[in-house]
Amino acid sequence: MKVVATNRKAYHDYDIYDKYEAGIELKGSEVKALRQGRVNLKDSYVRIKDGEVWWLQGHISNLETTYSAFKHDEKRPRKLLLHKNEIAKLAGYTSEKGYTLVPLRIYFNNRNRAKLEIAVAKGRKLHDKRRVMKEKELKKEAASAMKRYGF
């Protein structure tokens, strides 16, 4: 499995509850750009509309070598491929207040198919972000102290 890009900001801004693997409906030039790592997940999000799951604002850059007739819109909505029962589960989660769908990472699986890992998440407040950062820092200090004293 070759990870192309991760959305590190999602782990900071959201509490992650459930993860799903979704296929992506792409054009040829988009696949080639993905293989070169020309993708940005930072400001993208996932929505369910009319029983279909869509990845919105995902930025896949055009290649300089692509002929102008084959160039794609860099931020076009891309359909995600999931089973009906998974879509129903996700719709149930997102109907609850505060829950949303966020893309976590994009990668090529062992069969060389582009996949997007999406998660059901709930936004964190500022004080929650600070608390989580403090806990991580304490954990890191404890681990280094244990290592230093040979435990």
Curated annotation (Swiss-Prot):
InterPro entries: SmpB, SsrA-bd_prot, SsrA-bd_prot_CS. It is found in: Cytoplasm. Its main location: cytoplasm. GO terms for molecular function: RNA binding. The keyword Hydrolase does not apply. GO terms for biological process: trans-translation. The keyword NAD does not apply. SUPFAM superfamilies: Small protein B (SmpB). GO terms for cellular component: cytosol. Pfam families: SmpB (PF01668). Keywords: Cytoplasm, RNA-binding. PANTHER family: SSRA-BINDING PROTEIN, TMRNA-BINDING COMPONENT OF TRANS-TRANSLATION TAGGING COMPLEX. Belongs to the SmpB family. Required for rescue of stalled ribosomes mediated by trans-translation. Binds to transfer-messenger RNA (tmRNA), required for stable association of tmRNA with ribosomes. tmRNA and SmpB together mimic tRNA shape, replacing the anticodon stem-loop with SmpB. tmRNA is encoded by the ssrA gene; the 2 termini fold to resemble tRNA(Ala) and it encodes a 'tag peptide', a short internal open reading frame. During trans-translation Ala-aminoacylated tmRNA acts like a tRNA, entering the A-site of stalled ribosomes, displacing the stalled mRNA. This is SsrA-binding protein. It comes from Nautilia profundicola (strain ATCC BAA-1463 / DSM 18972 / AmH). The lineage of its organism: Bacteria, Pseudomonadati, Campylobacterota, Epsilonproteobacteria, Nautiliales.
